[in-house]
Each structure stands twice: as C-alpha cells, then as structure tokens.
Amino acid sequence: MKIFFDGGWRPASGMETAVVVHGRDYVRQGLGPGSAMDAEWLALLHAVELAADLGLHETVFLGDSLAVVGQANGTARCPRDHVRHRQALAALQPLSDSLRIHHVKRSQNLAGVALARLHER
C-alpha cells in the first residue's frame, strides 16, 4: 500500500499537511508556526498515524523531501531542531509493521498535488 505525504508552510496560515491513501486526501491546515521542514515531518507523522488508524499493513510512505526521508531512515544527519520529530516517529514505529519510507519526485507526490489544489488561483 502506497501512502503519499507532503507538508507545506505559508506565511499567513503557517503549516499544513496532506496525506493521500487509496486516492483520498487527508489535509490538515492551520497547524501553527514552524518551518517547511517541520511541516514535512508533521506530514510523515500524520501518514504513519493514519495508516495505523486505518489498519493498513505493508505500507510504503512516499514523500518528496529528501532531507526528511533521509533523516527518518537514519541515512542523513538529523538537525537538533528536528530530533523531536525523529523521536516521535520512533514512538510510532510499533503502530506499523515496518517503516518503509522512500523518496518520490515532487511531480509524482499525490499529497503535494492535494496541497497545491488548495491554493490554486
């Protein structure tokens, strides 16, 4: 099962996340101040929580942030400001069979498409 995740940050409204499962968008907006990287991490955490809530197994989490994917997989250094997100992910790991987190191009990230649709002009 593929689960797409993406986070965004807007100066006026703050952070937002989107997760796409089975073609359905799960969007959270107004998540307060933070950075674009915080938003990407929150999107991954949202995706893992949602997979557990939906009872999904053998999931692959797909996001377009190389930094977050690398930090989550332990293949990239996690900056001090984001260690709390890595710890939150580790706490969620028992909810999932295994955490398979992979990078996908931005143009292929269905969650990114969902966020972009929110702000079409």
Regions found by a protein language model. Give the residues of each.
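Short, conserved alpha-helix that lines the donor NDP-sugar binding/gating region
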Residues: 40, 44
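RNase H catalytic domain
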Residues: 8-12, 45-116
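RNase H-like nuclease fold core
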Residues: 1-38, 49-53
